[in-house]
């Protein structure tokens, strides 16, 4: 009866408290009953359960083998913690990682738990498996108030973890100022190194902790490197911590020059150095001028080293340009002051800011004299010999006994007389054209061109940084004009110099024209790389389409009105952000990424030429499109043309191909290339043939009675449009017919669609600068925008006709098709362009190729062979005039020469 009553009472208590009132007999089950109560600090319930239980309060459970005392300390359950301590819980019991309850209380800032643990003799000096004590945890988290209480119980405040780091190390690294002061006040060793030799100051600088570094330096911390020689300053510069560098320089002024010298270290990230020097230069005008003057001096020294032929060109070139880039960056962002702004130092102003360029004048003087010297020798060779292809520098490599002769050093200021006398064993003799080159002679241009060009690049950068954006320094223009012949000699010898060092051409149209013929002769691939290098210069992420985007930057468009909705969102979007990356999402869809962007461009490229918008009309061959001169039927046509330009500019910027092809004349408009009468064939082949006929024949006695005016249909009414002022009264004659043809071409191909072209270019140039796109011709621009079309050679052969003596089985024809199979896809496209004027095959294949009068098969006509004769073409009738070459090798050579030399144009069959 008594036992039954006891069970009834237990049942009643359990139901009232909604929990068990007795612990299970085994510790494993019991501990999981108690743990949630301990975490909630339900000390009465825990006390009641423990009162009649044999539960071991030090029982370790779980994967990390912690006791309930660990749980209480970790959660801040102070009442349960005291209860467990009174029940005999061990305050120094370590879990599997070596942590005691005191470690956990310190890590989580549980002050009351820490105090109670210390009352019950918790050992503050116990280290966990990583060597960390409770004091380390307080230092890591900056719990200064708790640290004050704990250090009173610590026997050694400099106790080390497994890496030899003390609490002071970690407090400095995490920037906890009051914690650092508390540890120092408690006797922490301010210069104690860890196992790698890193001091607390080193740790503070590694994370740019300016305030803790200042506290350490104020208290006498030594400036020491680690065992690998890495200094606190090295760490500050590597992280771009300008404020911390400023503190170091305040206490160690000698470090200023160390930072300046670091600009020569190519292992340091340039943008980090810029950040540091930018911060330092903002502190005062005098500091700003000091930095610039020091950088100018270092640049001058490096520049003269670069001009030394015995130096390592690659290393010195990179060093000079790196220093100059940093110099120019700092110059532009000087400290705020009433006089701050662009300082035209090269235009005669003698202000303090312009004077920072003075040390560089020594380098520019050496550059100028080098170029004058080479120009003099070029002139001498022109007079002395018909062979002026090289200037030779005689220099002995070794004497007969094997003794090395000192290498040639370029002249420094005041030493040019040695170069001209040629006296002394180690001094060079500049040979005239009449002297015979020996095996030990070197081409002076080959030896110096790259070096001098790199210095020219540095000179341009320094000139430009003093000019307002978009303006070219008059001094630099004068310099290029003065040395025009030598610079052209450089690039003729080594065209790569243009891509490596003559970047100024892209920013100076007045100079670009001098070198354009050389640039256009360079491989398409090299020009593409140069194009994108400068197009994306300064952008933070080269993987543009994949860069993370802000939700506000996503282009949200509707599929059912993709053209109009895209036009609206693109017009409102930030242009700079669109250059950096594109993110597109279709309304009501979740998908994003490159696939969606690709689909967006594909759909838009089809919509741009959708007849419903009346923006473009098909050309005569049915494969290309031309702006519609009557697009004004759409009230928003100019806005849409601007949008079309934006889309093509964006596609080119992000290397996304569009599924659309334009007429040659429209590509020319984009490039700024004048159109000619041959371009008329794309919209009116018969009229193009008539213009060709006028040019090819004498019209003096034909009585055509043409004037410099034409009749044009303007919305159903015929109007006479003069080709030039008073054109209606000016007769077309044999003498002025070429002008007439050009003017009528411009009317048909340009004037009639000028507003549309202007609107398109306005959008296109938002993303593609005119100076960059002019690197290409109209065929290459098509390739950039739309990619390489595929050509089915078997279909080509099947739909080819032969005339003037050729038949399908002739050896020359067999060789021709073998060559077509052998050449690259790019060269096949060139061949198709060469003969038909188009790079694409129309829908349905070669059977549907159009000529001047309708369908016209590709035709090969025989031409008598003469040595070096090139193939020609008549594009109006798709005819290749192929000489009867004696071998396949000669045929291939002559054909490729014709294709790559751009022998395009119309001839009459």
Swiss-Prot record:
Residues 396-433 are annotated as: Disordered. The N-terminal lobe of the HECT domain is important for interaction with E2 ubiquitin-conjugating enzymes. The ANK repeats ANK 3, ANK 4 and ANK 5 are important for recognizing the RAC1 substrate. It is found in: Golgi apparatus, Golgi stack membrane; Cytoplasm; Endoplasmic reticulum. Residues 574-909 form the HECT domain. The keyword Manganese does not apply. It catalyses: S-ubiquitinyl-[E2 ubiquitin-conjugating enzyme]-L-cysteine + [acceptor protein]-L-lysine = [E2 ubiquitin-conjugating enzyme]-L-cysteine + N(6)-ubiquitinyl-[acceptor protein]-L-lysine. Keywords: ANK repeat, Cell cycle, Cytoplasm, Endoplasmic reticulum, Golgi apparatus, Membrane, Repeat, Transcription, Transcription regulation, Transferase, Ubl conjugation, Ubl conjugation pathway. InterPro entries: Ankyrin_rpt, Ankyrin_rpt-contain_sf, E3_ubiq-protein_ligase, HECT_dom, Hect_E3_ubiquitin_ligase. This is E3 ubiquitin-protein ligase HACE1. One of its GO terms (molecular function) is small GTPase binding. The keyword Cell cycle applies. Its EC number is 2.3.2.26. GO terms for cellular component: cytoplasm; endoplasmic reticulum; Golgi cisterna membrane; Golgi membrane; nucleus. The active site is at residue 876. It comes from the Eukaryota. SMART domains: ANK, HECTc. E3 ubiquitin-protein ligase involved in Golgi membrane fusion and regulation of small GTPases. Acts as a regulator of Golgi membrane dynamics during the cell cycle: recruited to Golgi membrane by Rab proteins and regulates postmitotic Golgi membrane fusion. Acts by mediating ubiquitination during mitotic Golgi disassembly, ubiquitination serving as a signal for Golgi reassembly later, after cell division. Specifically binds GTP-bound RAC1, mediating ubiquitination and subsequent degradation of active RAC1, thereby playing a role in host defense against pathogens.
